[in-house]
A protein has these predicted regions:
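Nucleotide-activated sugar donor-binding and catalytic core shared by glycosyltransferases
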Residues: 1-156
């Protein structure tokens, strides 16, 4: 799908890194602002080099959320992964970490905004709105649950 936009110069002002997966590298796809990568070994370096991630809405988007990279999500609509991808996308959009692109027209609209260097897309995201995850959060949730039970035990 990305080739459609590269071929008609829609995204000439944007550098694109396309992770294509093992054995999917295509030497015929040559564009000045486009680079294919089969696999990323160091995700820290990769994430520090991007401003926006366009991807499906599987579990892999959580790393981007954790380090506040805005997302354009295109949930997979077929098969067994469709339900969790829709749920992930819905939650991330509601939390202002992502924008949902449910069809090619909505994705093209966002690409055109980016091409015009329209930063409103980034302003829509809560850059400092970190989802509460990680060990400290989990430990505190467990302690809260234990405290609820301890209080219930002493009340009865």
């Amino acid at each position: 799908m990305i080739y459609k936009y590269l071929g008609n110069n829609t995204l000439k002002n944007i550098k694109i890194i396309h992770i294509v997966g093992p054995n999917n590298f295509d030497n015929s796809k040559k564009f000045e602002n486009y680079k294919q990568i089969e696999f990323i070994k160091d995700m820290t370096d990769f994430y520090s080099s991007i401003d926006l991630q366009v991807s499906r809405a599987g579990g892999g988007v959580l790393e981007a959320v954790l380090i506040n990279i805005p997302l354009l999500l295109i949930p997979y609509k077929h098969g067994t992964t469709s339900t969790h991808q829709s749920m992930n996308a819905e939650y991330l959009v509601k939390s202002k970490f992502a924008k949902l692109c449910s069809n090619y027209e909505s994705l093209e609209y966002e690409f055109k905004k980016l091409e015009q260097l329209d930063n409103s897309l980034f302003e829509e995201f809560s850059k400092n709105n970190v989802i509460k995850i990680g060990n400290d959060f989990i430990v505190n949730k467990i302690i809260d649950e234990i405290n609820k039970w301890v209080i219930k035990i002493f009340i009865f």
